[in-house]
């Protein structure tokens, strides 16, 4: 495999010009009545206003949503129609579970590299509050049959076959379709398999909240978060509401395990909460950005996706995807100024950190003669991570990209890794560069 170059045929790089997100809100709080499509429109509309770019110049929108709403299956197109862009703007939706907005950003980048577009918007939105509540298979079949009946007798005959349990609503599935295991159960398995203790998990969660709280207090986050006025428009939200600004390590020990009550170590406090929110990034061909006089945040240097088995260690995607992107870009872990890893669970993040430094894991699973290297924790999730900020599934990647680029710029430039696990044994890794 040759060296990866994220450039057009003329040698122009793919620039990230701006990024923005809504505040992230815990399920059933400030965004309790706001569907994901409206969160997406909200953040893209504000992004266009802040960058002062003519919406008609946007060639393409690629957006994602993990928890799909049947009434708006193509969230990207709804965003185009709802934010004043040219009616002919190309728009399509993607999903890669928790790595969705990494995928949408890569899709826009590849369109730029191919010369198909000059300017695109990528991102994702999810609501854990406004969910599609389904019905049982038997009720669904009966409703279809009912629509084809003509007489009262025929209708009664169809309805007579339904029991009380058939009428119960069916919430969205939280388990893997292929295994029946939830993400939390997998995190629990990884903690046990890789010797990640409860104390280590709680310490990472405390670190995440402490660093995120400090980042907000230091004014590092406000510039990438819009003020939202959600329905019913009686109050606004300008900050994430999941961050524990008074986090103490002792407080985490009080919670009971959530997935293995007797022997477990994964709790609600050392996991990401269900969250509502949206995030987006504006990408351009480097030359076009300069023509428009846009300040460039940074560039995509490389990216990789991975897929592994789902029976165990399903959330080890960052280790596999990072190995691929380091190889394709010719970089080493030591070349990186910052490393930002999605914290789905403290157990998952710590297991990956451990495997980055494992020669045995590298030889048996990555095709490497030795480990990628030990992660310098002074470079790792320096502003806190998903455990603190929250995790609207499709929005997290765009949050990480914007947050990382802005922090790199504050530090005078360099290279950074963004990486995430995702359901289905998927993983994503992206190298970002700031001059």
UniProtKB/Swiss-Prot annotation:
The active site is at residues 98, 391, 421. GO terms for biological process: fatty acid beta-oxidation. Its main location: cytoplasm. It is an enzyme of class 2 (transferase). Pathway: Lipid metabolism; fatty acid beta-oxidation. Transmembrane segments: none annotated. InterPro entries: Ac-CoA_C-AcTrfase_FadI, Thiolase, Thiolase-like, Thiolase_C, Thiolase_CS, Thiolase_N. Keywords: Acyltransferase, Cytoplasm, Fatty acid metabolism, Lipid degradation, Lipid metabolism, Transferase. GO terms for molecular function: acetyl-CoA C-acyltransferase activity. Its EC number is 2.3.1.16. One of its GO terms (cellular component) is cytosol. It holds the Pfam family Thiolase_C. It is found in: Cytoplasm. It catalyses: an acyl-CoA + acetyl-CoA = a 3-oxoacyl-CoA + CoA. SUPFAM superfamilies: Thiolase-like. Heterotetramer of two alpha chains (FadJ) and two beta chains (FadI). Belongs to the thiolase-like superfamily. Thiolase family. Catalyzes the final step of fatty acid oxidation in which acetyl-CoA is released and the CoA ester of a fatty acid two carbons shorter is formed. This is 3-ketoacyl-CoA thiolase. It comes from Vibrio vulnificus (strain YJ016). The gene is fadI.
